[in-house]
Each structure stands twice: as C-alpha cells, then as structure tokens.
Amino acid sequence: DYPILADADRSVSDLYGMIHPNSLNNLTVRSVFIIDPNKKLRLQITYPASTGRNFAEILRVIDSLQLTDNYQVATPVNWQDGDDCVVVPSIPTDAAREKFPKGVTEVRPYLRLTPQPNR
C-alpha cells in the first residue's frame, strides 16, 4: 500500500522546488517522488513535459523497494515481481544457502541468484 498525492494548489510542488520559478502556471509537473514510511526520499524521476510517465516502471520500483527492504536481496536489470533476485554481496555463500532455502545459484562468485523470497 502506498499513498498517491494530487497537488491541485501546487503547495507540495512549491515546497519541494519542483517548478522552475519562470515556468508557465499551466505547465504540468512531471516529477515522481517515492518517499518511504520513514519520510526518506527513495526515488525521484523528472520527465520532460513532452514525455509521459511510465507507471509500470514506477510500480516495479515500489515492488523492488518493498522487497529489498524486507529481504537481503537486490533486484537486477529488468526485474519483474516474481523473478529471481540477487543475493546481496555481504552474505557469504554458505549463509545465503541457509537463509534462502529455495536455493542459491552462483552465476559468478559475486553474482548469486535466488528465487524471490516472498513468493
């Protein structure tokens, strides 16, 4: 679950400096901020006015952040919910095999994959 904010009066946009002071009043802001429950900014994307936002990517990032906050994994390029994850390098391989009972595949000593832990 995550809240989505609409900023009809531009108060949040002004607070975070999202609008250039010389911009037109009617120009939409195409910025996305993901702020976690601890009020920490985790992602900021600003799109050109000519480019629409990619909501599939935004949802993918939220899924990744929620997963990696709860498990010692990272998500690789083009990862989708349900795909294998990367075991973080700080966990030794023996400990990783114990921590991830679904299995750990060692592609390289520095690259170990495991099925998504919360599936």
Task: Locate the predicted segments by residue.
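Chalcogenol-based redox active-site neighborhoods
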Residues: 1-119
